[in-house]
């Protein structure tokens, strides 16, 4: 617990320092500016690699069109790959003035296409640079997060998703417990 608390304080202090030293000369007006000036910076701070031998961020990543079979491919704003070469997450970016929910349907289609192609469903992130939401549509509702997660955290979420979970209908019911009167 002490290690977690120490790490939390370290990250909190570096975040405050980053906020103080980071300045934007102008507010990003387009999606491209939002991506370059805000989202790209945040991804790099979380350890994601945009180039080189350890590249794991792929921008404008092409996926099969789920709406028109054989139609033109669609472009996912960002696909974040794991060490196994499978997609851990996708990010649907919007410009700062847009509601991030505007990209929800689009992101869901991208997740479906990536799952069909790679056999692994990615975690979905929606971001307009100022607000980021994470959504694992297989496990839980969308929720606001402070940033896109790093590689290790996303890999852990994917592994947890794959763990064997007993299906309640397959667990035998002990009638000696369930059929008795509560007041006896």
List each language-model region with its residue ranges.
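ATP-dependent helicase/translocase motor core
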Residues: 1-184
């Amino acid at each position: 617990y002490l290690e977690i608390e120490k790490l939390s304080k370290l990250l909190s202090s570096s975040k405050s320092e980053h906020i103080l030293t980071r300045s934007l000369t102008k507010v990003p007006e387009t999606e491209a500016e939002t991506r370059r000036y805000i989202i790209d910076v945040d991804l790099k701070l979380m350890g994601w690699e945009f180039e080189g031998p350890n590249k794991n961020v792929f921008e404008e990543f092409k996926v099969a069109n789920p709406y028109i079979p054989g139609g033109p491919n669609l472009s996912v704003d960002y696909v974040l790959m794991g060490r196994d070469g499978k997609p851990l997450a996708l990010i649907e970016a919007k410009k700062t003035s847009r509601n991030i929910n505007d990209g929800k349907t689009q992101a869901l289609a991208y997740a479906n296409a990536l799952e069909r192609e790679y056999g692994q469903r990615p975690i979905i992130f929606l971001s307009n640079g100022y607000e980021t939401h994470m959504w694992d549509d297989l496990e839980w509702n969308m929720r606001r997060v402070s940033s896109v997660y790093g590689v290790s955290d996303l890999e852990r979420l994917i592994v947890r998703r794959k763990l064997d979970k007993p299906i309640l209908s397959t667990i035998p019911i002990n009638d000696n417990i369930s059929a008795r009167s509560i007041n006896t």
